[in-house]
């Protein structure tokens, strides 16, 4: 097997073990391969060994890499996992299949208008700033329930779940447990949490989506 195939198999094995340890089915967990800062040739290597779901942080970088890859692999699914500026909403709606970065009223309103205009409705995760960090995107936990209701009832967004990025200097498990609890409280079945350093913990605590980069691609360029 190629190095990409080996890395992918190892991550999937660890996801499966973590899922089974929690009494879950491995197929209940979606692996999002985070390809930010890596060129299209690295993405293609993973596509060739069966990976189909990828995550990108920046709209412009994704625009440079993924149209050609999507043409070659029509079943490729692309997730936006980085902060989204309102002036990039149209481009994001056109390219991404899932938006994991919905985090404020103004953005929700712009996305709703764009979805209506284009007739394309990417599934939405609401990003929660569980650590309440000033420098980080995400709705604050105290404001989440009202924002979920607004996204559903006012903006009519296809909200399917929640996403978080825990503070690097805090125990990730506490944030994963909080996100899972908030998702359940709002009737949301999907939770995107866990990265290369902690995705097994996230799976044990109920993650339906894990965002893994360095364990698949190596260090960022």
Question: Which sequence ranges carry the predicted segments?
Answer:
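Conserved alpha/beta-domain cores
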Residues: 1-190, 195-197, 203-205, 219-220
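Gly/Pro- and small hydrophobic-enriched strand-loop and loop-to-helix capping segments
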Residues: 207-221
């Amino acid at each position: 097997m190629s190095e990409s195939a080996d890395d992918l198999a190892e991550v999937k094995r660890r996801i499966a073990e973590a899922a089974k340890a929690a009494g879950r089915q491995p197929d209940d967990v979606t692996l999002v391969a985070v390809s930010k800062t890596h060129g299209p040739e690295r993405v293609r290597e993973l596509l060739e060994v069966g990976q189909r779901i990828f995550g990108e942080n920046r709209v412009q970088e994704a625009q440079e890499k993924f149209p050609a890859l999507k043409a070659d692999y029509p079943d490729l699914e692309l997730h936006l996992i980085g902060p989204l500026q309102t002036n990039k909403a149209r481009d994001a709606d056109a390219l991404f299949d899932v938006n994991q970065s919905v985090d404020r009223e103004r953005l929700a309103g712009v996305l709703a208008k764009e979805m209506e205009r284009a007739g394309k409705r990417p599934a939405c995760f609401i990003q929660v700033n569980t650590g309440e960090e000033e420098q980080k995107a995400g709705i604050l936990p105290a404001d989440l329930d009202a924002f979920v209701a607004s996204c559903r009832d006012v903006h009519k967004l296809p909200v399917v779940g929640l996403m978080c990025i825990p503070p690097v200097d805090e125990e990730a498990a506490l944030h994963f447990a909080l996100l899972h609890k908030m998702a359940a409280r709002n009737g949301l079945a999907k939770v995107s949490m866990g990265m290369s350093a902690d995705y097994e913990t996230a799976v044990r605590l109920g993650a339906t989506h894990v965002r893994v980069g360095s364990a698949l691609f190596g260090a960022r360029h």
